[in-house]
Amino acid sequence: MKFATGERGIQQDFSFHHRPDRVNNTDSYGYGKFANAYGEWSWYVAGTQYKFSTEKINLLVDYYLDGIYKQMVYGVYEDVGVRNRDVTNKRNGVERKGTLEIERLLISTDYRKKELEEIIKLRKGQATPSLSFAKFFWQTEHFVFQRPNFYTSVRMFSTRNQNMEQPYNGPGKTTHHRADGTNY
């Protein structure tokens, strides 16, 4: 677990790149595959001689709180602006994310415990959003602005990053211009 700025992995701004095209993959590969796999392993080895070092588990928590959850609507719902070619897949509405990965983290560490517990409460519908922030994920050209009563984001691109993913096997052919400043 380390920063991999300019390469595949966690970027210094807590976004995630899965490929060298530098397209934002924080929600898909960075959350669903990378962070959750590390979180699961941290849970398996918590309290043993194999537990993650404080530095590494803290980086994982920071990645969840300052990267993944800040690119989600209130840390609860997927932000459509972060999705790539999979945005063309049909879905049945918007669902709250679960709490399993957070509960596992809290067994591994108490670092930033209050913030993690707030996300659990939000996801269970036991609290209302209180966090206000504006964050530009400069490695992936994604800007998020949140207040307790609203959330908005803008997806952009630059000369450093690809606009969108390549349209592999058809998905994504209609999404090329989404990063021309799409606002959600």
Residue ranges and their predicted role:
Residues M1-K51:
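Active-site lining segments of carbohydrate-active enzymes
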